[in-house]
Amino acid sequence: MHILFYGNCQQGALRRMLNMLKHDYICCHNTDITETDLVNQLCKYDIIITQPIADNYRHKSYLSTKFVLEHCKKDCKIIIVDVIYFDFYYFDLTYTHFNNSRLTKPGDYHYTCMQECYKNGNNISYYINNIVNNIHFKHTDELEDTANNSLRELKRRYEANKKTYIGSNIHFVYTGDYIRSNYKHKLLFYSMNHPSKYLLQFVCESILDLLDIPNTTINYDMDPLSSTKCIMYKCIQPCVFFDIMKCEPAMYQTNNIKDICELYYNVYNEIQLC
């Protein structure tokens, strides 16, 4: 049985947690792979675990889920997992562009309010005291609206995917119900799109159920996307039942919020963000 995990870092994390490192992983971000190479590889697999990848992704028609389905073996079993995301915990998180390119220093993720503080001449202490540690920064109703908006969007995408990718060999893993039932009880994400081990465990269990494989492979101790943990604002605390003070941020081997903020401010000074 040959299995391919095809997609973003979430697929790579699932492969590791399932202890399936002997099976292949192709990152959909990799534009170096040629169409011919991908076609030659796809025909080898009995099972492909993937996610919805748009047509003409990164200006390459062959990186899409549609292309994968068209060129895999006819009897290949396909499992399509949600592109997992949730805005609730890190509602201020964003991607930033500078000089027409995504700004990936000091990391992929940036904080809108931190950038506004920097641009307005407010120092790091102001950002931490008035935003990060301000339990009243966002009202609980507004935060729960954010959670519900993400859940509705996950459901909308799931229903659209079922209409787009059709076949008796195609199966889906939907994460919205699990997130809705659990997001207040345990931390399910380290960024808006890096799930914690709890959500990855649910997806792994769902995959094994669909494959009718006994659950003897999942590494429940592994937390594969935990190397970077974003800053969670204290206003989240009234909305959840777990202690967010135990959910420390992590970046470049530091858990200190001030040190993490300094990394960002140094980059913004360097590029003269305005």
Predicted segments with their positions:
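Extracellular glycan-modifying ectodomains
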Residues: 1-274
